Every structure is written in C-alpha cells, then in structure tokens.
Amino acid sequence: MTIEELEKVPFHFVAHMSMEDMHTTTYESDDGRFGFCDHVPFKNGEPHGRTFRHYRIGLKVYKSKAKFIEALKDV
C-alpha cells in the first residue's frame, strides 16, 4: 500500500483519554486495519512539550512514521 492509497482510507474517532500529564486521542480506519493515536503532554493544565503520534497496522504499533511507511509496503 502507498501513502496515496492510505490517504483515501476513511478514519473515525474512537476514544479520547484525558489524564493530568497526557491527553490521547485515538482514531481507527472503518475496516479496523489501521489506526493512530495523537498524544499531547500536559503540565499544569496546559499543553507542554512536543505532540507525538503512534501508528498501528493490525495489532502492531509503530512509533515512527518512517517505520510505519516501510511496513505499509507489505500490506
């Protein structure tokens, strides 16, 4: 699969978890094959630090976009 093909896959909101030190929002493709989570660190009630994203194919989680893109070639 290519990035262009992935961009055509519809995603929907699944969950949002708000903790004192981190907010996490999770999205999943309509067919359940792909997902991603956006993580926002918080400190004293305000966003603090760098936001990051984890990617998922099936049950395998990728912490870098480069590794995720490499794994897409096998899908």
Go through each PLM region and give its residues:
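A short, charged, amphipathic alpha-helix used as a generic interaction element across diverse proteins
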Residues: 64-75
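Amphipathic alpha-helical segments
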Residues: 1-12
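Acidic, low-complexity, intrinsically disordered interaction modules
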Residues: 12-66
